[in-house]
Amino acid sequence: ASVGGKPIIFGLTILVIVWALSGLYRVLPDEQGVVLRFGKYVNTTQPGLHYHFPTPFERVLTPKVTKVNRVDVGFRPASDTGRSSGVGNVPEESLMLTGDENIVDINYSVFWVIKDAQKFLFNIQSPIETVKAASETAMREVIAKNRIQNILTEGRSKIEIEVQEITQIILDEYGSGIQVTQVQTQQADPPEQVIDAFRDVQAARADRERSKNE
């Protein structure tokens, strides 16, 4: 009986070894490892070879933390709208009130990375919607403090920096684990129905400036 049991014991030993070795895992240079024990956070590991208790006790999530993600606000690229070309405008996101009570139609993109994988995975449900909502709040706040002339001309870069800073503050308050790397204005115009009249006013103003300088 003892002879017949040896293959079984040997087979079980091999299975245990294979199971134990399944706990080895590698975190790539562009990742962070988030170790979960029965679904609860244990610790975060950095790039390299690591070990965790095998399934069903622990598992590891490895989100890409150096990948630059992009969220578009006020518009959707053709690839997202099913159109063959151009962009689809989203007025409910893009139309904003300026400090001098004009309306501006502004499209912009927010670029972001994961700075804390544990917070990113556990504190927010939808990263895209979270970034969009935070940046829209920030943009509306900043636009409301600026005159339309400033928004459409030399003030853009300063506005982008301020929006990035406020968006980051909001995301940090959420404990989102997200780092905003850039806010980039894609387009800023008066609404379509008044754009021609606005451009006429701008041209007249430029003519007056030229006349003064001559």
Stretch-by-stretch model annotation:
Residues 2-24:
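Single-pass alpha-helical transmembrane signal-anchor segments
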Residues 18-37:
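Aromatic-capped interface at the extracytoplasmic side
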Residues 31-32, 36-74:
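Short extracytoplasmic
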Residues 51-54, 125, 129, 205:
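Short, conserved loop/turn and helix-capping segments at secondary-structure boundaries
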Residues 83-84, 92:
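N-terminal regulatory modules in eukaryotic regulatory proteins
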Residues 91-114, 118, 123, 127, ...:
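Amphipathic, coiled-coil-like alpha-helical scaffolding segments used for oligomerization/assembly
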Residues 192-214:
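Long, charge-rich amphipathic alpha-helical coiled-coil "stalk/tentacle" segments
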